[in-house]
Amino acid sequence: MDQFFEHLNAGEREAAVALMADNAEMRIHVGDNSQLLRGVERVGGWFLRADKGLKMIPADIRDTGSTYECDVLVVRPGVNSQHLDATFRVEAGRITAINLAPR
């Protein structure tokens, strides 16, 4: 996961997406709703299309082996920063699931 955040925060989005499994899933919670993206094309595309300058800074990391939980500070130019609860599942060295929810 350290590599994922390093690549993402350095603007190397393609390298960050390359760490995802082909069958990756991402659930994004907004208000009372959530959206589920399936497949590396959709999940990776979300990161590739994000605002230029997007940074995701992890803190309060809890790494339990296959699950990586953290508080993520999301910073985007021109927008207020936001804290998210983030959970990542990693299997065989690939990110297979991401869950992002506002704190």
Spans of model-derived segments:
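Short beta-strand edge/turn micro-motifs at domain boundaries
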Residues: 69, 81-103
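Surface-exposed, charged secondary-structure patches
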Residues: 38-85
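Short, aromatic-enriched amphipathic alpha-helices that serve as compact interaction elements
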Residues: 1-12
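A short gly/proline-enriched turn/hairpin at secondary-structure junctions
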Residues: 25-35
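Structural motif
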Residues: 20, 64, 91-92
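Short beta-strand segments enriched in hydrophobic/aromatic residues
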Residues: 20, 74-76, 102
